[in-house]
């Protein structure tokens, strides 16, 4: 809200579209680049049309700003900006989600040597993300079954991803593990969560490698990225890999700003910097 207020005060029109499947029929296709990008570009065009019908004229210039899944969406909008047939000026992405497969694998490795309660926290986060992935896949493949990814004991929790957001899912996975810990001698040994090698399931693999990964094609407009060194939700390693892969296909990252922020403070600590970035990319008229 602080960012939006400051952008409005600077003279910008702010459009905040929601994602497909949130507040509309159907399942939300979590971290689907194309879905997010279409939501944004359609919203920008619709907003300009709405304002012009009321004799409120706006510039054809526009930028995207987003944090976390919103940062992921902002990068997707950069790829599909030409759909709007306007004048796209650039992207500011804060802790943008990417390389979810790597995040899941690295999380499992980290949990392997962690204490039981650290394991619980890590596993709950990983399983909440995985549940949202499966729900998103079911948007276009309704026959896809949670049991192809989860075990019987966790699939019932994962199904909640079709109606709940990340935090409630996290809480449910965590609570179930807590009961197991309390009744199994303070250990998670023997607790089964996901099917072996589920990331090799074709629909999951396609999602992780292709559908969810931003900047797989060259983007020629400016890109500014903020990343927290203490971020455990979108680790710096994931963003480093995103930038490396983007550079390989010819995309230039104009600025990569890092600091001692976690996932939330990467955004809250940089509101004024982001407003300044927007003014640089698209000076107010």
Residue ranges and their predicted role:
Residues 9-15, 58-62, 86-90, 219-222, ...:
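Loop/turn elements at helix/coil->beta-strand transitions in domains of secreted/extracellular proteins
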Residues 30-53:
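Alpha/beta-hydrolase active-site loop
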Residues 219, 224-231:
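Short beta-strand/loop motif that positions the catalytic acidic residue
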Residues 200, 204-207, 233, 240-285:
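C-terminal catalytic histidine-bearing segment of alpha/beta-hydrolase fold enzymes
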Residues 100, 229-234:
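Acidic catalytic loop of the alpha/beta-hydrolase fold
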Residues 97-216:
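Accessory cap/linker subdomain of secreted extracellular hydrolases
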Residues 46-117:
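Primarily recognizes the serine-hydrolase "nucleophile elbow" in alpha/beta-hydrolase
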Residues 1-38:
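Cap/lid segment of the alpha/beta-hydrolase catalytic domain
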